[in-house]
């Protein structure tokens, strides 16, 4: 998000933080995800609610009339805050509701360590899916119903991960919102990391890193980015040696395979 949407999102999250202590956060997260699904489906409603020329009071009144008997008061407050705000694009409005849903879902994991646990579970599930094409196909095929996919996720993860992780994986699988499964899992992971006040570095290495190597890398990246760094490490033998590090959209490629590819590009040029 940029400009006015970024400012509005900051205010929505600030007001959400005031609501969370007295709310049933699991219910709040679930209901907000349902609102996301509604807004994604109802294009005209989404555009009308995001229209900067519209009256905030009128938007809030419409939301109240649509949702008052269907969701909790806490959910109604959050959605009302979102529709009263100004957004650059209709998509930004829905993304704000989705981010509020994610934060409500992980609200019981208050400490940075607990939030890192959710990140790790999302990352590990993403690696499992990437390594099992048949499982990925079962989770992403258009031919399977949402209920079938939801049941599959529950059978795979129930009792093995936190309730928050199970909820977020289920959302990424059943309502991808135009993202691939991997993109959805990474998006939720980034939102959790932002909540924990740190960045995620996805590190690809040919062999496992020792604890000492991980600590040194973490410290070096923290100095570079000026923020705590959480490492997600992928073992990728085909890179031969060295490391590839991705933080957000920035990639540091120090792999041998990367250097060979660069030499080949130069020779070809």
From Swiss-Prot:
Gene Ontology CC terms: plasma membrane; proton-transporting ATP synthase complex
Q: How does it sit in the membrane?
A: Peripheral membrane protein
Q: Is the keyword Cell membrane assigned to this protein? A: yes
Chief location category: membrane
Localization recorded for this chain is: Cell membrane
Enumerate the GO terms in the molecular function aspect.
Answer: proton-transporting ATP synthase activity, rotational mechanism
Task: Write out the entry's keywords from A to Z.
Answer: ATP synthesis, Cell membrane, CF(1), Hydrogen ion transport, Ion transport, Membrane, Transport
Pfam families assigned? OSCP
What's the family?
A: Belongs to the ATPase delta chain family.
Function according to Swiss-Prot or TrEMBL: F(1)F(0) ATP synthase produces ATP from ADP in the presence of a proton or sodium gradient. F-type ATPases consist of two structural domains, F(1) containing the extramembraneous catalytic core and F(0) containing the membrane proton channel, linked together by a central stalk and a peripheral stalk. During catalysis, ATP synthesis in the catalytic domain of F(1) is coupled via a rotary mechanism of the central stalk subunits to proton translocation.
Report quaternary structure and partners: F-type ATPases have 2 components, F(1) - the catalytic core - and F(0) - the membrane proton channel. F(1) has five subunits: alpha(3), beta(3), gamma(1), delta(1), epsilon(1). F(0) has three main subunits: a(1), b(2) and c(10-14). The alpha and beta chains form an alternating ring which encloses part of the gamma chain. F(1) is attached to F(0) by a central stalk formed by the gamma and epsilon chains, while a peripheral stalk is formed by the delta and b chains.
* Entry protein name: ATP synthase subunit delta
- According to its UniProt entry, this protein's organism is Thermobifida fusca (strain YX)
Q: What is the lineage of its organism?
A: Bacteria, Bacillati, Actinomycetota, Actinomycetes, Streptosporangiales
């Amino acid at each position: 998000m940029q400009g006015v949407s970024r400012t509005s999102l900051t205010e929505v999250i600030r007001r959400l933080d005031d609501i969370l202590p007295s709310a049933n956060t699991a219910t709040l997260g679930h209901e907000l995800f349902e609102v996301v699904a509604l807004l994604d489906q109802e294009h005209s409603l989404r555009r009308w609610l995001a229209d900067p020329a519209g009256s905030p009071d009128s938007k809030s009144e419409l939301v109240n009339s649509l949702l008052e008997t269907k969701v909790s008061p806490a959910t109604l407050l959050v959605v009302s805050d979102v529709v009263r705000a100004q957004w650059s694009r209709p998509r930004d409005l829905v993304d704000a509701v989705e981010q509020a849903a994610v934060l409500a879902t992980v609200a019981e994991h208050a400490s940075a360590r607990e939030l890192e646990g959710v990140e790790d579970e999302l990352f590990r599930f993403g690696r499992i899916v990437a390594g099992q094409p048949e499982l990925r196909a079962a989770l992403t095929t258009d031919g399977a119903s949402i209920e079938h996919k939801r049941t599959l996720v529950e059978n795979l993860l129930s009792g093995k991960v936190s309730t928050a992780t199970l909820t977020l994986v289920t959302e990424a699988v059943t309502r991808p919102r135009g993202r691939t499964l991997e993109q959805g899992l990474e998006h939720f992971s980034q939102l959790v990391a932002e909540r924990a006040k740190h960045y995620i570095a996805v590190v690809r290495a040919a062999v496992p890193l020792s604890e000492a190597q991980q600590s040194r890398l973490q410290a070096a990246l923290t100095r570079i980015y000026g923020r705590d760094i959480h490492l997600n490490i992928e073992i990728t033998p085909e890179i031969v040696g060295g490391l590839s590090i991705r933080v957000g959209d920035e990639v540091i490629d120090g792999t041998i395979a990367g250097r060979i590819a660069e030499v080949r590009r130069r020779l070809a040029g």
